[in-house]
């Protein structure tokens, strides 16, 4: 399976978030990549901050890769899990640009763990992962049917 892992371009203009505005490595996506590649999947990992790509450019790169599944983070890094940005505008913007060209979609991060239904509605993803995402993402990639994958939520 082809899987795209995306850390959107986080910006804080007009944001009510007062946390650290410096870019951080998306460790959870790196761990996902390692597990997915071990299982034989083809993985594209993109980080808007490190690669200086806006969300439209990220979406174009994902679409060119033509993945079967796209995973997007709802917080800039695990460092933000305890105090995540309250809004979902950044991942929502990326998904809007992706416009259905990324296969099935999954969101990982604190929002899906704390408020899965609103996260699903606001992002329009197929599934949110609740809790630690690495092994769950690997399991999603290995299954055709997602309804029985534990630690996920769907509408």
Where are these regions (language model features)?
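Short glycine-rich His-centered loop
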Residues: 3-21
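Residues that mark the start of a beta-strand
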Residues: 2-3, 42
């Amino acid at each position: 399976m082809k899987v795209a892992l995306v850390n959107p371009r986080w910006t804080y203009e007009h944001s009510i978030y007062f946390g650290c505005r410096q870019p951080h490595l998306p460790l959870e996506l790196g761990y996902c990549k390692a597990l997915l590649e071990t299982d034989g999947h083809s993985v594209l990992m993109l980080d808007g901050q490190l690669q200086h790509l806006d969300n439209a450019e990220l979406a174009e790169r994902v679409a060119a890769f033509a993945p079967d599944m796209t995973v997007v983070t709802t917080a800039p890094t695990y460092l933000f899990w305890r105090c995540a940005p309250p809004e979902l505008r950044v991942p929502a913007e990326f998904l809007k640009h992706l416009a259905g060209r990324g296969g099935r979609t999954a969101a990982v991060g604190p929002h899906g763990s704390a408020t899965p239904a609103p996260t699903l509605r606001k992002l329009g993803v197929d599934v949110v992962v609740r809790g630690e995402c690495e092994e769950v993402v690997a399991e999603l990639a290995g299954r055709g049917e997602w309804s029985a994958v534990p630690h996920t939520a769907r509408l």
